[in-house]
Amino acid sequence: LTTIKAPSRWSGTRNVWPQQLAGHGSVSPTALRAILVRMDINARNIATTAADAPTTPAAPAPVVGRFAPSPSGRMHLGNVFSCLCAWLSARSQGGSIVLRIEDLDDRCKRPELAAQLIDDLAWLGLEWDEGPYYQHDRLDLYESALRRLKDAGLTYPCFCTRAELHAASAPHASDGTPIYRGACRSLSAEVARRSALRAPATRLRVPTVDDLADDVIEFVDRTYGAQCEALATECGDFLVRRSDGVFAYQLAVVVDDAAMGVTEVVRGCDLLGSTPRQIYLQHLLGLPTPHYAHIPLLMAPDGRRLSKRDRDLDLGELRARFGTPEALLGWLAGQTGIAPGTTPRSAEQLVEHFSWDVIRKHRENITVTAE
C-alpha cells in the first residue's frame, strides 16, 4: 500500500494556494494572503511548479504555530495548557503565532465569548502575531475546497442520520465517531431521489482496501511517535459538510492551516485521531502538511476530562484565585512538569524551561488538583 507521510525536509516557498483554489471566483481580500510556509520539496502535490523551485537549498522558514479556540464557553485549565504549549514551542524556535477563532457551529457564534477568549489570552501573556481570524468570515474558501473535491468525484451525498449510524452498532474510530461503512456510497438514482426529501450531508470517499493506493496514512507525532491508520478500515468515508450546511471541522482546519501558513499544530491528544483524515485532505488538495504535536489531557482528580460544560477549573475562577498570570502559569508549569516547583513565572520566562522531551514523559493524561 502506498503511504502518505508527514513531510520531513522543508524549503521556503510562497503559498499561492488560496488563489489557485478560488479559480475565477470572488474571494475576500483577507483570505487571499500570501504567507511564507515550509513545504516538502519532494511532495508529489507541491503547490508550485518545478520551474519555481529554488536551485540552491533554502534556509528553513520560520515556525508558525496557532491558537484555534472555539468560543463555546470560558477556557478551562486544559485549554490554557494547550495554548501555552503551542506558544512555548513556537517561541522557543523563534517562531510566530496565528490566532484563529473556530466559530463555524451556531453554538460558537457568540461574540461575547470570543471577546472573552481574546481577553484571557492577552491576560495570560500569550500574545499572537496575526489575527484574530474568524472562521465564519472564511466560508468562501471552504466552499471552494469542497467544490474541488466534488468536481473530482471524491464526494457523495449521505442521508444517514445519527440514529441510523448508532443503530447499526458500527465500531468507532479513535476519536469516537462511528466508522462509516458506505451505506450511501453507491445509491441508485431512485433511492437517492427519495432520500433527497431530507437534506444530505456530504462525505469524502476514502480509498478502499482493494484500491491498493493511498489507503494508509503515516506520520510522526512529536509526542506520541510514529502513527499509522488505514482509512478504509479504521475511519471510513468521513463528513466534509454536515446536513445542516455547516462545514466539517476536518475540512475547515485543513483549509485554514494552509492559508495561514501554519507549520506546526499543537493540540490535545483527543484530536490525534483526526490527523490522518486531515493529512488525506491535504494530499487531495495539494496542501503542505504541518508538523503535529499532541499533548496529554488534563484530568480532574475524579478522573474526568476537564470540560467547559462542567466549568472545571475555568479561567474566570483561576484568575480570581491566582490573581496574576505569573502565579497561574508557574503553578501550571509545575503541575505538568514544564518547570520545577510552583514559582511564579511569566510565559516568556517559561520559554527557557520548555522542552518536548518533558512533554513526552507525560504521554498519559495528567491529573491536576485545585490545591
Walk through the language-model features, giving the residues of each.
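N-terminal Rossmann-like or analogous alpha/beta NTP/dinucleotide-binding catalytic cores
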Residues: 35, 40-173, 269-270, 274-287
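Alpha-helix initiation and N-capping motif
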Residues: 114, 139, 162-165, 177, ...
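Short, surface-exposed acidic
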Residues: 129-131, 289-292, 339-345
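Active-site cores that bind ATP or allylic diphosphates and position pyrophosphate for catalysis
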Residues: 163-308, 314-319, 368-371
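Low-acidity, Ser/Thr- and Arg-rich intrinsically disordered low-complexity segments
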Residues: 2-17, 26-28, 33
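Cationic, low-complexity basic patches in intrinsically disordered or flexible, solvent-exposed regions
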Residues: 20-21
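Non-catalytic terminal extensions that flank enzyme cores
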Residues: 26-73, 92, 97, 192, ...
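Short, mixed-charge aromatic SLiMs
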Residues: 105-115, 300-304, 352-360
